[in-house]
Every structure is written in C-alpha cells, then in structure tokens.
C-alpha cells in the first residue's frame, strides 16, 4: 500500500528508516558516518507553488551505517541534528522519484545544506543509497 506525502508523513519516514536498516549497501557505504561527530540529519520540506501546506521536518539519526531513529517533528529546534538538508516540496518529489540526485540537487542549489559540506561529499555514495531507499518506499504525492 502506497504512503502519501505529506498526509502519511509519520509512516513514510518510519518506512524509510526501516529501508535504510534493511540495506546491506547502506550499512557498507555509511560505515564511519556519525562516528565522533553528529551525523544526524534534519530533512526540511518547504512549501512551494505545488504544495502550500506547512513545512515538514524529518529527523533521521545516522551513525556508522545504521539509522538509529526516524520521525517527523514539528519542532526542528527541539532535536539535536548535525546536518540539515532543505528544499522545496517539488524538489523533494523529484528526489524521491529519482529524477534528481541528492548531491546534484545540492550542487545546483535546489537543496541547501547546513553542516560540513566536505564531510557530506566524502559520503556521497551513502547519499545515493539513501535516495534509492527513499525511492523504494511506495510513495504517492498529494500535490
């Protein structure tokens, strides 16, 4: 059964976290991420011309190839993240559909990163697998 974004946001982010933990490839390419530094992510989906609802925030705990937590939050300042990845709804839609890569979107300015860009680029293979696993969640979009 497909999960619909944004109305099924809670279930969707939990499903993505499960996909990451089921992925041997993510376990391998994410090895070392978040070790001796805060590798947790805040993913921020902003309204745009396609979606005029509320901002969506997902917290994803990542450490050494494991997703330690994955949930939607209404309080982005209430979670301890080391990196934030921000973009508009339509851009996230393209990412989840694999029409845009995470690193390509970042380099083109379609996504913004708060955090250590150099470290993120060192783990670009993990970003690719994370995007593939997001695409593996059966997703429909309301807008």
PLM features: residue spans?
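Feature captures hydrophobic
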Residues: 1-143
């Amino acid at each position: 059964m497909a999960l619909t974004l944004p109305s099924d946001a809670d279930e969707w982010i939990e499903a993505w976290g499960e996909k990451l933990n089921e992925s041997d490839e993510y376990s391998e390419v994410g090895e070392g991420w978040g070790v001796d530094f805060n590798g947790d992510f805040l993913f921020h989906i902003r309204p745009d011309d396609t979606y005029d609802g509320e901002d969506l925030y997902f917290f994803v705990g990542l450490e050494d190839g494991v997703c330690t937590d994955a949930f939607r939050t209404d309080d982005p300042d209430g979670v301890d993240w080391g990196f934030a990845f921000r973009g508009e709804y339509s851009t996230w839609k393209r990412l989840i559909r694999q029409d845009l890569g995470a690193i390509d979107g970042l380099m083109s300015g379609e996504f913004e990163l708060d955090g250590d860009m150099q470290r993120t680029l060192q783990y670009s293979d993990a970003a690719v697998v994370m995007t593939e696993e997001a695409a593996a969640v059966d997703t429909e979009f309301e807008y």
